[in-house]
Amino acid sequence: MQRLSLGVPELDQAILGGIPKGSLVLVLGPPGAGKSILGKLFLHTGLVAGVQTFMVSTAEADQAIAETMAMFRWTAGVPERVHVLDCYSWRLGGKRSKYSVPLTSLTEVSVSLSKLFDDYKIHPEGNERLVVDSFTDFVKYVGVDKSLKFLDYLRQKLRENGVTGMLMLEEGVHAPRTIAAVEYSTDGTIRMKVSEQGRFMMASRMQATPLAQKWIQFTIGK
């Protein structure tokens, strides 16, 4: 089974080298635990490997994403191979690109995602990566039921195209049954937490991967 590296050696080792290709993994943790940075590191690791990467962004525009990655010196390939589906700018009353869509219309989100994949000629033999940051905003703006239906569509879309994905979800915001439903519709879960001792992560479940569930301290540096 082909696996794609997260970019965090300790966690890659714990999950036999990375996330299984074509799977969609939930990243669950409280604010400040490092979910968004992990997502950008996942994309950066793909850029280093020379593949196209995609971000479905609900919390920041493409310029902010590029600036954050530049802070960590993850700049190689960013303008050419980080493609942002902007689900954020509509809140400000603007449309920054042809890939800007309102989060309140999941039909438009789905159509634009398909257009992105078509425009960049994504095919199952590739090793492309996608991050959704954050699925919490989907639930906030369109509700649990519609968000879960979109999640099922997204999972199938990634699988058909051989794209490996991460889905960020805020812990402490959603009802336990919502988190359970999201876990049911994804292929694995990476949990994150933060304390005075630092940041920690753990793979609590992963498709086709035996796991020793153990918290791993990590630092994402420059």
Where are these regions (language model features)?
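Conserved P-loop
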Residues: 30-101
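Loop/turn-to-beta-strand initiation segments
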Residues: 52, 81, 125-129, 160-168
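Conserved nucleotide-binding/hydrolysis micro-motifs of P-loop NTPases
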Residues: 59-63, 88-92, 135-137, 171-175, ...
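Phosphate-binding/switch region of NTP-binding enzymes
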Residues: 163-164, 168-222
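Pre-Walker A adenine-sensing motif
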Residues: 6-18
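Phosphate-binding/switch loop-helix module in NTP-utilizing enzymes
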Residues: 91-159
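Short hydrophobic/aromatic beta-strand immediately N-terminal to the Walker A/P-loop
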Residues: 25-28
